[in-house]
Every structure is written in structure tokens, then in C-alpha cells.
Amino acid sequence: MRQNPARRAALLDAAIEVLARDGARGLTFRAVDAQAQVPAGTASNYFANRDELLTQAGARVYERLEPEGGSPAGSPEERGDRARVAELTHEVVERVSTYRTGFLALLELRLEATRRPALRAVLTERIRADVDANIRLHLGDGRPGDATSVELLHLAMNWLILERLTLPDVFPEARLRELVEQAVERLVPETRGEVPAEG
């Protein structure tokens, strides 16, 4: 059966909305059809089974999280500056937080991956590739710090975003911005080759 790529993308976007709203248990072909406002049976014509739908929904979240115009880069003068790392980190936090349903859907997929080895393999590969790409960009642009700095920022910002989107009253917005600045200051040296001072 011939398939429409735009329709497939719309169905995956609907699946992401269902995951964020109803959790993985609520993700059914019928729920996706209803969310996408398409005739019953449409989603089952595009996806062989629920596992395929879950896996492709995870990939779609990452598609939508990509920055427009590719990876951000500064001028050669600012690429190696810790302030630029802080600026980029704020941009990532804002971009991911703005796509709230995508982040929440990804949390549901992560939980589901603990029970579905195929989904776990796909998410592991995708997230590891994302971390590796961030490391390559960071080092390639001559930014301060090393691969461990990037990995620690990845872990810290993921939890900060989780807190912001699920329990927003724990930290006020102004404090979250300060915490991003502090994370960069403590995890990334001022210049390349230095080790951050002990706090």
C-alpha cells in the first residue's frame, strides 16, 4: 500500500501527543487515529504493530528537537568561550522545554524501553549518537572542557528539564537559569585544557 510521508509524520506527532497525555499504556492505534482526526484504521495501515509505532515515535521526537538550520555555531572568536557554552546550553534547555509533549513522550518511551529490548536498543543508539555528536561539535569548535564535560552537562540538563516540565514549582524560572549558569561554570573550564576549580 502506498503511504503518504506527511500523513505518517502527522500520525507520529499524534502518537507523541497521546504518549505525553495518556502514557505508553494509552498508546493505541485507535487513540492515534482519534488524536490525528483521521478515519479509524489509518494508523494500523502505516505501522505494522505497536512496537513499530513506539520506535518511530521516539525517532520523530528527535527529528522535531533538532535545531533549525542544523547545529548552532558561533564565530571563530566566540566558539572557545565558556560564556558561549552557557549560551548554547540555555538554547538547548529552551528548545527542549518548549516541546513539552515531546520530552514527556520520550520519558514514557524510556520507561517502556525497560520492558521492550528492541525499543531500548533504538533509544540507546539514538541518544548515544546525540551525545557523541555534541561531543564532536564541542571539541571540533575548540570549546573549553572535554568529552566528560559534555556528558555531565547532558545529564545535568536532562534532569533540570525534567524538573522544569514535571514539577515546575520546585525551582522558580530565575533559579533554573542560575542553575544552568552554575552547571556550566562548575563543569566547563574557562579555557580549553584547564580543569574547573573545586567549588
Each PLM stretch: what is its role?
Residues 66, 97-107, 114-141, 148-151, ...:
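Amphipathic alpha-helical packing segments from all-alpha helical-bundle domains
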Residues 76, 110-113, 164-168:
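Secondary-structure edge/capping motif, primarily at the C-terminal ends of alpha-helices
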Residues 59-65:
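Short, basic, alpha-helical segments at the C-terminal edge of helix-turn-helix-like DNA-binding modules
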Residues 69-103, 149-153, 177:
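Hydrophobic alpha-helical connector segments
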